[in-house]
Amino acid sequence: MNSGSHARSCGRVQDFAAVREDFDAIVGAVVYSTMTTVDAKGRPRSRVLIPVWETGGEEPLGWLGTYRTPVKTAHLKGNPHASFSYWSPAQNTVSVDVVAEWIDDPRVREHVWDLYRHGSPPGAGYDPGGFWEGPGDPRFQVLRLEPWRIQVLRGRDLVSGVPSRIWRRDHG
């Protein structure tokens, strides 16, 4: 079996566009995601959060408006990789593996604030004013989430034996 046929049998896709519609639909419907990081001893820690995603370009980009808690900060300092998982009772799932980085640029904070207010993708997001005074509030911190792997599986495909679709960022 050549590598191209292996990729197809595993559901691997070359372009994010091949999973964008289902990614947006599932994330927009589920909204809440489990974010998992690991500590210095490799032990996982999960928390439920709402990231937002920009999916209109060739490659997706995520953002998380959050508090810079000591645990999250220590975990990401030791290992910037994190995973976000979405699941619905219809067995629709999205898993996003990212490299996370704290961003302190005021323009980026305003941009992320607006993404939350307007929903990105539609359905995801919320009014961050319920937690913070505005994008300049020092408690409002932003994580840039650069996906390197995204796996999408619709429940109807699961029961039909269709493999999940996996997109990976090409780092050359």
Regions found by a protein language model. Name each.
Residues 31, 60, 96-98:
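Structural detector for hydrophobic anchor residues on beta-strands
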